[in-house]
A protein has these predicted regions:
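Compact, glycine/acidic-enriched structural inserts
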Residues: 113-154
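A surface-exposed partner-binding patch
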Residues: 1-113, 169-231
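Generic low-polarity alpha-helical segments
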Residues: 47-50, 122, 158
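Low-complexity, serine/threonine/proline-enriched polar segments
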Residues: 150-165
Length: 231
């Protein structure tokens, strides 16, 4: 195994091993082709390339975080960002997504960007508070590989987490799949298991992106604060 990354003098391997020990093994792992690794080396942080090279793509956190290659998401980011001055599909790359429509994006300008397709929110702490940008590799470990799973889950009307009940009702998600609410929450749908279906992730995410005017938000307290519209 070859590793090129390090964080504060420690090999990226140590950090990746710690992530896998906490979150469990990668689910449904697939090999990343050498050409893909070459394309994204120097664009994405080294520790993510190390993960791809040595472990591949798949799902972490019991299926809550799906790692992906960014290429197929360019059209989705165009739909979300429109002509925004701070965000563009040209320098923002989807590197992971949750089962209900939360995207983890790497921006070469702002580093980690989060997109909540269900609620039309974009957050980028590296933009709203640049002092939080310290180390690219550490940022990937904290916000992607070691991501807190609850932020990718959704809750029902009784404030109960829905991912595990959704898996029990509909089965585990395969690569390229997501859970979608019908009708969509933006169209008055309710967050209930009875309203969930297993859907093609990209197709459904594009639909969600067309239903909302996205807002740049900041999470300074318990709830997001709108800063400005995206676009």
């Amino acid at each position: 195994m070859t590793y090129i990354s390090e964080i504060k003098g420690r090999s990226g391997k140590d950090h990746i091993d710690s992530v896998l020990k906490r979150s469990g093994p990668l689910i449904g792992a697939s090999v990343v082709p050498a050409a893909t690794l070459e394309t994204w080396t120097g664009v994405l942080p080294d520790i993510l390339i190390d993960f791809w090279r040595n472990h591949g793509l798949g799902a972490l956190q019991g299926g809550l975080m799906r790692l992906c290659v960014p290429d197929e998401f360019d059209g989705l980011l165009c739909e979300v960002f429109q002509a925004d001055k701070d965000f563009s599909h040209k320098d923002c790359h989807v590197i992971g997504y949750g089962p209900f429509g939360n995207l983890i994006v790497w921006s070469t300008r702002h580093w980690i960007v989060r997109i909540d397709l269900l609620h039309g929110r974009v957050s980028a702490s590296g933009l709203t508070d640049p002092s939080k940008k310290h180390n690219e590799n550490a940022s990937i470990v904290a916000h992607l590989l070691g991501h807190q799973p609850d932020s990718l889950n959704v809750v029902d009307d009784d404030d109960k987490k829905m991912f595990k009940p959704a898996v029990s009702a509909l089965g585990p998600l395969k690569t390229g799949q997501a859970f979608g609410f019908f009708p969509a929450l933006a169209m008055g749908g309710a967050p209930q298991i009875a309203n969930l279906k297993t859907v093609p992730a990209m197709e459904h995410f594009l639909l969600l992106a067309q239903l909302k005017q996205f807002q740049l938000v900041d999470y300074l307290g318990n709830s997001p604060s709108n800063l400005r519209p995206i676009g």
